[in-house]
């Protein structure tokens, strides 16, 4: 690596470390505790109006079961609305291109995808979805799916911080505050900045331009900047254009690239410090943050190294070392593409500024492992935090078993119920990618979708279902997934991955809230410092990533050795 690459990585992490504690404290005040902030003078009346119009009583607290029921009811209503909008878009306004309604299976897949914060796209946005569908059906979910994840994370924090309580907050109040005080203001500012960088924002269908060859080309446009801002900030990832953040009208400059990466990580990173504030343990927050940052750096440097080594066949033909620039934008280069790919697969975002299908086998392996570790390396908005709490509980439990102490976390005893729910969430998240991948690999509909045979074809299948279950949404684009079987199975994978982890973690929150914290003494396992950080890292890697080792051996690992031997499919 050159000095410039080290500088970019240091600048990114430095800005993240400076901004995250500030935003984390703000989220603690505005969402976790519902206190007055400097935004309340403007948005407070809007919040109260929403409560009155919706019949919400923000002071009414809910048990974890009531909280979960509200979450599921809200999600079901949002799914039905978006499904209807997509099916009927040819009869709705703001459709200057005259796009027809989507097929039932594509509408089902897309509605589930945006509902679950996955944003998997089996279609090209600029040639399939109308402006109305983008703004009302999809951009709406970019806000509320992220807000739902943030609300669940806040509920988990309350469960850890409360003592002898039967409630964990109010889902509706948490949802409204998350949108009004966190997502909406930041995305508004970011959208304006992105417009200044050259991201388009118009209601026009597009424009026709003369090319250098003397011909004419129609360039699709639309309300892009507003959707890009929230798709990054909410770790959604679904692009306005099919090329996503590689498109010059969606991510035109190196500065816009940096801002979009910061937007992806900023809320998940900040929530770590909100947790520290909630439980009055900032050292614990910094330890968890450094674990995330170290895993992120390892992923970025590994991916960068794999791409700079290139492929032996091209090196042999060129008679000189050739880096792998296939599928990458020259304006970002290998390091800018590698860091973005690591950010987006760490954070369950799924936006891409380079084609992951064109990565080297080891480069693709890094992106797969990032997701398979549970999307806890900062992770999605909310989901990264409560996913990390899951691994923290397992770490504390295992540490207690090793030293013969009763495991406790923040003064509260970890009992069989919490461990059972945590393991249930892990098993639920790990099973669908392996099961669906196995079925697709031996089925006619699965093989028919492949453009590549052999190990890389299997990697495409495994990547798709891993991305779906982990609510990431990125893809190895050589897979033609727009068919009834693919759309339905991927939608099921997304639903299982989203609610199969959310609901058990709400159960953990309810169980922990009912306990009384004991004074933390010398016999309590410390949840800060090097020892805890190392043990947490090992648990994430062993429990999270090694679950998939046999499948990875059949995909990118085999493909890497075939590449070294000069084998092609």
Curated annotation (Swiss-Prot):
Disulfide bonds: none annotated. The keyword Membrane applies. It is found in: Cell inner membrane. It is a multi-pass membrane protein. It comes from the Bacteria. Pfam families: KdpA. InterPro entries: KdpA. GO terms for molecular function: P-type potassium transmembrane transporter activity; potassium ion binding. The keyword Glycoprotein does not apply. The chain crosses the membrane at residues 3-23, 68-88, 136-156, 179-199, 259-279, 284-304, 384-404, 422-442, 490-510, 534-554. GO terms for cellular component: plasma membrane. Keywords: Cell inner membrane, Cell membrane, Ion transport, Membrane, Potassium, Potassium transport, Transmembrane, Transmembrane helix, Transport. Belongs to the KdpA family. The system is composed of three essential subunits: KdpA, KdpB and KdpC. Part of the high-affinity ATP-driven potassium transport (or Kdp) system, which catalyzes the hydrolysis of ATP coupled with the electrogenic transport of potassium into the cytoplasm. This subunit binds the periplasmic potassium ions and delivers the ions to the membrane domain of KdpB through an intramembrane tunnel. NCBIfam families: kdpA (TIGR00680). This is Potassium-transporting ATPase potassium-binding subunit.
